[in-house]
Amino acid sequence: MFHATTIVAVKKGEKVAIAGDGQVTFSQNMIMKQNAKKVRKVYNGKVLVGFAGSVADAITLCEKFEEKLEQNSGNLQKSVVELAKEWRQDKILRRLEALMIVANSEHLFVVSGSGEVVEPDDNIAAIGSGGPYALAAARALVQNTNLEPAEIAKKALEIAASICIYTNNNITVLEL
């Protein structure tokens, strides 16, 4: 199975950024790819998405999420709740092993494989193997610097990559 990644997102005011590393690990012990793109803009560039977990599962969920955005005219909150509901109830989707962070200029959500939707109180989220390190770094940077969300997300991922063996420094940062 391919997995292991780190995604971090930071929202300050109406600015939001998401960053992901590029490493894809196969079977816990082999780097298969070093420059994968695990973050993207969807819905005409108005929504950011980052995913971690099984690659095929994450892509499937991202596609489902895009469908929900289209059905709900870009309403992020409604789309993410409907995705989570479908994820929990569908026998096939329920088996997918992935996590997603989705964000726009108004909201930032983490959607879990068990169908949970969480909007972090501090507008900072991180998922994947290096998630705890990236989250701690991002929180420290938000509290102690005046950096922009994109700079915070990138720096937090760099810190995570220096600690987590499943995270690398080939970082993609997207912002709104």
Swiss-Prot record:
Subcellular location: Cytoplasm
Modes of activity regulation: Allosterically activated by HslU binding.
Assigned GO CC terms: HslUV protease complex; proteasome core complex
SUPFAM superfamilies in UniProt: N-terminal nucleophile aminohydrolases (Ntn hydrolases)
Top-level enzyme category: hydrolase
Alphabetized InterPro entries for the sequence: ATP-dep_Prtase_HsIV_su (IPR022281), Ntn_hydrolases_N (IPR029055), Proteasome_sua/b (IPR001353), Proteasome_suB-type (IPR023333)
UniProt keyword Ligase, yes or no: no
Enzyme nomenclature, EC number: 3.4.25.2
PROSITE patterns in alphabetical order: PROTEASOME_BETA_2
Catalytic machinery residues: T5
One function term, GO molecular function aspect: metal ion binding
Catalyzed reactions per annotation: ATP-dependent cleavage of peptide bonds with broad specificity
GO annotation terms (biological process): proteolysis involved in protein catabolic process
Principal cellular location given in the protein's record: cytoplasm
Oligomeric form and interacting partners: A double ring-shaped homohexamer of HslV is capped on each side by a ring-shaped HslU homohexamer. The assembly of the HslU/HslV complex is dependent on binding of ATP.
PANTHER family xref list: ATP-DEPENDENT PROTEASE SUBUNIT HSLV, METALLOPROTEASE TLDD
Family named by the database record: Belongs to the peptidase T1B family. HslV subfamily.
Protein name: ATP-dependent protease subunit HslV
Organism: Caldicellulosiruptor saccharolyticus (strain ATCC 43494 / DSM 8903 / Tp8T 6331)
Underlying gene: hslV
